Amino acid sequence: MTLPLILGSGSKYRREILDRLHLNYDVVKPDIDESAISSESPQQLVGRLAEAKARAVEKRMTYDNAIIIGSDQVAVCDGNILGKPGNRENAVRQLSSFIGKTVTFYTGLAVFNTEAQQCEVRVEPFEVEFRQLTAEEIERYVELENPFDCAGSFKSEGLGISLFSGLKGNDPNTLIGLPAIALLDMLRTHGINPLNKD
């Protein structure tokens, strides 16, 4: 019998991905300090935080054992780590700084088997090339989508696609914060496969 699956995230976007994959899961929000360590690269940061989120959920879950998914994401432009904008002004500022540039998103993914006390961590990169945007286009985009809770100030699964001239990476779900191809590969090692009959 496979262990129950828990998503260690409050993100509705990550839940939507798991729903599309026909996975049965519970949600437990982790409560961790997400501060970066000064010498940490973006890849190290998201890997560490994804694992920390998965391990934090173990302390809060109601199951004896489970498979816990932790995930974290940052956007990097010109060597600077970008977070969620939080408000309209910051979103406009972020998007304006991306004009004609490539922004790399790093998504850390952790799958933690609490029974075996084993945690596998992967970091998936994804590049977004922004086209030449006008100030009016940026203002209108922010007005229509309110991307204040999204790293990089856009929702690629919606109108955000109109901001780009190109995408480069293994899995477009990585932009939404949960690389599904890597996740399914990791889950299969724990006996979880949505294509198998129960």
Swiss-Prot record:
Organism domain of life: Bacteria
Reactions catalysed: N(7)-methyl-GTP + H2O = N(7)-methyl-GMP + diphosphate + H(+)
An MF annotation (GO) of this entry? nucleoside triphosphate diphosphatase activity
According to its UniProt record, this protein's enzyme class is hydrolase
Please give the InterPro entries that the UniProt record associates with this protein: ITPase-like_fam, Maf-like
What is the annotated localization of this protein? Cytoplasm
| GO BP of this protein | nucleotide metabolic process
Q: Does the keyword Cytoplasm apply?
A: yes
Residues carrying the site annotation Important for substrate specificity: Y13, Q73, E157
Provide an example Pfam family for this protein: Maf
- Where does the record place the catalytic residues? D72 (proton acceptor)
Q: Which cofactor does it need?
A: a divalent metal cation
Q: Which CDD domains match?
A: Maf
Gene3D superfamilies attached here? 3.90.950.10
Q: Name one GO cellular component term.
A: cytoplasm
Chief localization class? cytoplasm
What family is this protein classified in?
Belongs to the Maf family. YceF subfamily.
Query: What is its biological role?
Result: Nucleoside triphosphate pyrophosphatase that hydrolyzes 7-methyl-GTP (m(7)GTP). May have a dual role in cell division arrest and in preventing the incorporation of modified nucleotides into cellular nucleic acids.
According to UniProt, the name of this protein is: 7-methyl-GTP pyrophosphatase
Species whose genome carries this gene: Idiomarina loihiensis (strain ATCC BAA-735 / DSM 15497 / L2-TR)
